[in-house]
Amino acid sequence: MAEAPHTLKFERLRKRPDFLLAAKAPALSRGAVFIQMRQRTDDDPTVRVGFTATKKIGGAVERNRAKRRLREAARLVLPLHARPSHDYVFIARGGTGTREWARLLDDVKTALISLAADLDRGGTKVSRRSNGALHDAAPSSQPDPTVSG
């Protein structure tokens, strides 16, 4: 792989409050990975990275395998696509542990590129609907069907 244009320092996110702050930031799902990207307000250029897997994807063995694969994918892709002073949280999805390696790397890369492009466009937040599906939280010109008037 090519070297990053600038050398970034990486640290792991380990504390729950950091994960909760990232949960309020823009996020994107691609294939077997869900990534949250939070821009910090401090002047520290360090990139902080966290990994998580819920019990929905399986038992401890499956969760650990998924997180190991996400850590390695992040180690390879983040130096090329991470932004200084940002926190990234990688959340394993159902196929993370079994997805073909090249496809998982592509999922991570395209998610990071899309999140960065979204931030450059103004950072519309991606959020969850009540049914768990993702939608763009930017204001829509469509009237809200739940509002009568």
Curated annotation (Swiss-Prot):
Keyword terms: Endonuclease, Hydrolase, Nuclease, RNA-binding, tRNA processing
EC number, UniProt record: 3.1.26.5
UniProt biased composition (Polar residues): 139-149
GO biological process terms on file: tRNA 5'-leader removal
InterPro entries found in the cross-reference section: Ribosomal_Su5_D2-typ_SF, Ribsml_uS5_D2-typ_fold_subgr, RNase_P, RNase_P_CS
UniProt xrefs under PANTHER family: RIBONUCLEASE P PROTEIN COMPONENT (PTHR33992:SF1)
Annotated protein name in UniProt: Ribonuclease P protein component
Lineage of the species this protein comes from: Bacteria, Pseudomonadati, Pseudomonadota, Alphaproteobacteria, Caulobacterales
